[in-house]
Amino acid sequence: MSLENKNIIITAGGTGGHIYPALAIAELLRQNKANVTWVGTPNSMEASIVPEYFNIQFIKSSGVRRKGIIKKITFPLKLAYNTLKSRSLLKKLKADLVIGFGGYVSGPICLAAAQINIPVIIHEQNAKIGLTNRILAKFATTICLAFEIENLHKQFSSKQLAKTKIVGNPVRKDIVALNDKARIYTDSSTLKILVLGGSQGAKAINEIIPKLIQKSNEQGINIKVWHQTGKLSLEETKDAYKDISQNHIKDIAAFIDDMAIAYNWADLVICRAGALTVSECAIAGLPAIFIPLPSAVDDHQFFNAQNIVNNNAGFCLRQQQMTLENLLAIIKPLNQDRSKLEQMSKMAKKTLIKNSSEQILDCVKKILNNK
């Protein structure tokens, strides 16, 4: 069916892990002639990213997890107020359907939609269902998951399970295109490692990588690194590289503008295990060493990595396990036998769904066709 003149609301915010999958869907909806409006919170990441691409409306919203007693007491009142404001906004926008990708802003918008009989799709990017989506699952028309969730039958009712689909994480087209490209691991003397700390950086990873390169050189392993530090650690990390030859450094930057180029360049990635990073590495067929963020809610980054690890397409080290000895124990055999990297690349591509965006689009069309 055509989506022409259909008013679809995207709500997502807080982190890139929520925002970038939502952007991929929003773009596909626009290509299918839908009218797309984004709802986010002011003074947020989405407020700085989304306006370049889509019309965005704002409501104030905040979470309750790990907050003080006063905020926990006032939270229900604020949620009720924001939900009421969201109802007015949805009526003003003449919304036909709402898609929530997580973040606190999704709560009041999706609740408001359900209250006034507007269909709701929610998408969970992580291998652990977040608090907002656990609540919204009761009201959603369709529940989309990126990963198989352990013991989901204990978290969802039979009615909720019946409306649940595993669709993967939407990623950008230029990264999906890497899925069709075979990675060739030659007997090159250089092992190219991409290091990603996430948009805010990862201090522990940033500190150990320069030491890893020095130690590797001592053991005859020639590493070249492309290191994304995050904005907070750029100068400090650059200083840690000052005694390392430029022959071992492709670039050290706070951000990488074109991730498809970076993924295509690398033989191996060392990174956190945010949902989007895990999905992009898998789709790009890039073997990975995942270092889950220790403070991640419900340890979700550890669980995000497990599908790839269990399929022999990557490794996972807890941050306290991220020693030079453990990293070298992984890297040295891969450097000596590049066919292991090639096999890991093939397995990585099989672990995730690459047509996630199209599957979510299909959900949208089915719901609106039956509306």
From Swiss-Prot:
Pathway: Cell wall biogenesis; peptidoglycan biosynthesis. Pfam families: Glyco_tran_28_C, Glyco_transf_28. It is found in: Cell inner membrane. It is an enzyme of class 2 (transferase). GO terms for biological process: carbohydrate metabolic process; cell division; cell wall organization; lipid glycosylation; peptidoglycan biosynthetic process; regulation of cell shape. Keywords: Cell cycle, Cell division, Cell inner membrane, Cell membrane, Cell shape, Cell wall biogenesis/degradation, Glycosyltransferase, Membrane, Peptidoglycan synthesis, Transferase. One of its GO terms (cellular component) is plasma membrane. Its main location: membrane. It is a peripheral membrane protein. This is UDP-N-acetylglucosamine--N-acetylmuramyl-(pentapeptide) pyrophosphoryl-undecaprenol N-acetylglucosamine transferase.
